[in-house]
């Protein structure tokens, strides 16, 4: 059934990582273990599930950097940090929206533990940290990257701030913060891609 199919996918993914540099299979093994732990227990725990999702999403950049070598890893590590913090922020907002549904499913999320208001502040702090970290690659990618990511940062911070006055899951959902965050994250990835391509071409 689904378990066998998942196991096959895990095995294929790990085998595909073997021909790459030695650190890549290790990262693949860690990620597989985290995915298993997330699906069995972490996703029902406050913050731990959010951290797991944020790490796994950002680890795409870690894997790419490791595969390309030490110099590329130094460049992609800040992208991992930005992605980790941004996804963590959005995950917390989503949990604040879904308190009732999560409670029915037996999950115990961060907003249930500390409340909607404190969760909104935590999400905003994470996004602010992500926005600050997003300027680190400007050392390699220059002024045009800095200008592009500044525009994205302003958008994401304004969107993240919309959740700060919220006191209930209904207010968080009505703000549509989690949905609008996705657009900013897609824009950030586009800025990453275009900046990296421009540096290679020029």
Name every feature range the model reports, one short phrase each.
Residues 18-22, 40-44, 69-70, 95, ...:
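Transmembrane helix-loop junctions in multipass membrane proteins, especially transporters and channels
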Residues 139-202:
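Extended hydrophobic alpha-helices typical of membrane-associated regions
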Residues 5-9, 51-66, 111-116, 176-192:
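Small-residue-rich segments of transmembrane alpha-helices in multi-pass membrane proteins
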């Amino acid at each position: 059934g689904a378990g066998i199919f998942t196991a096959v996918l895990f095995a294929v993914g790990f085998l595909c990582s073997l021909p790459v540099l030695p650190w890549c299979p290790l990262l693949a093994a860690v990620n597989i273990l985290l995915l298993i732990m997330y699906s069995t227990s972490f996703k029902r725990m406050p913050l731990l599930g959010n951290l797991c999702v944020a790490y796994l999403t950002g680890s795409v950049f870690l894997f790419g950097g490791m595969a390309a070598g030490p110099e590329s890893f130094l460049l992609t590590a800040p992208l991992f940090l930005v992605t980790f913090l941004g996804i963590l922020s959005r995950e917390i907002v989503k949990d604040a929206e879904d308190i009732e549904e999560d409670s029915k499913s037996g999950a115990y999320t961060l907003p249930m533990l500390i409340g909607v208001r404190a969760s909104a502040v935590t999400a905003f702090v994470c996004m602010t940290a992500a926005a600050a970290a997003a300027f680190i690659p400007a050392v390699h990618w220059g002024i045009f990257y800095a200008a592009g990511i500044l525009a994205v940062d302003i958008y994401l911070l304004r969107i993240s701030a919309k959740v700060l006055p919220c006191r209930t899951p209904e207010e968080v959902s009505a703000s549509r913060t989690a949905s609008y965050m996705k657009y900013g994250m897609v824009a950030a990835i586009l800025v990453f891609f275009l900046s990296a391509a421009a540096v290679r071409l020029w």
